[in-house]
Amino acid sequence: MALPILLDCDPGHDDAIAIVLALASPELDVKAITSSAGNQTPEKTLRNVLRMLTLLNRTDIPVAGGAVKPLMRELIIADNVHGESGLDGPALPEPAFAPQNCTAVELMAKTLRESAEPVTIVSTGPQTNVALLLNSHPELHSKIARIVIMGGAMGLGNWTPAAEFNIYVDPEAAEIVFQSGIPVVMAGLDVTHKAQIHVEDTERFRAIGNPVSTIVAELLDFFLEYHKDEKWGFVGAPLHDPCTIAWLLKPELFTTVERWVGVETQGKYTQGMTVVDYYYLTGNKPNATVMVDVDRQGFVDLLADRLKFYA
């Protein structure tokens, strides 16, 4: 039986590819997709979800837009990475359908309520919508199997020296998620920076030759440009968000550890930092499964294999 999932995202090139991977995988049953502000403004990320589902001919999936700003802060976006539209590069179709007439939290709650079994929430943007859901619907916590997030890092940040972008945008929301008591799986920069897509991988995807694989290659063409900056030391572009879906499909590709994680919400230099108690120094019980390594070639092979679904 397919695993029911609810995807909360802020497309974003890597979010878009996570959607592609999830919907090409019969092991997963995508019940709904909600959008969060982050990689671009809330209006643009919602539109990008609709554009991607139109491309994939999955206009049957309920979609709703989420919070327009973080819980306690002003919104920061990553337009320097993802461009003016949030999905610059390919020519994507205009949305062929409309979002639900409700908020992201309302759609999430409805999805959980109606599911016969607990649902896995996959969150690849800031954690605002998920935190609002947890705070407003404590009665539904038991309907959440786990929360798989792309965010954080044990070491270096990518938005500040200490913080990864998704967590930095709304650290208060991330702290609510980590301390919720619900199992959390964290795909942070420690693993996503190893999940790099090289130019030759992009060409491999393009050569698959269907409309979706071509769009994915064109998304990566744009995404690779930002990551060519020598400061990163990358060979390719880290494909952050699809690591969450890949872990659900093939956990054997990833090395994980069980650790306690907290989020710094007030630090002068460390705001948004995920504090991972790697050496068990706090005495706190582990609250997260933290990804620390990935079989890069296996990850690329999985993407290539699933892109053939769209032939």
UniProtKB/Swiss-Prot annotation:
SUPFAM superfamilies, alphabetized: Nucleoside hydrolase
Active site as annotated: H240
Keywords: Glycosidase, Hydrolase
GO molecular function: purine nucleosidase activity; uridine nucleosidase activity
GO cellular component: cytosol
Coiled coil, from the record: none
The EC number(s) this enzyme carries: 3.2.-.-
GO terms under biological process: nucleobase-containing small molecule interconversion; purine nucleoside catabolic process; pyrimidine nucleobase metabolic process
Pfam families: IU_nuc_hydro
Annotated InterPro entries: I/U_nuclsd_hydro_CS, Inosine/uridine_hydrolase_dom, IUNH, Pyrim_hydro_RihA, Ribo_hydro-like
Homology family: Belongs to the IUNH family. RihA subfamily.
Known function: Hydrolyzes with equal efficiency cytidine or uridine to ribose and cytosine or uracil, respectively.
Protein name listed in UniProt: Pyrimidine-specific ribonucleoside hydrolase RihA
Gene that encodes it: rihA
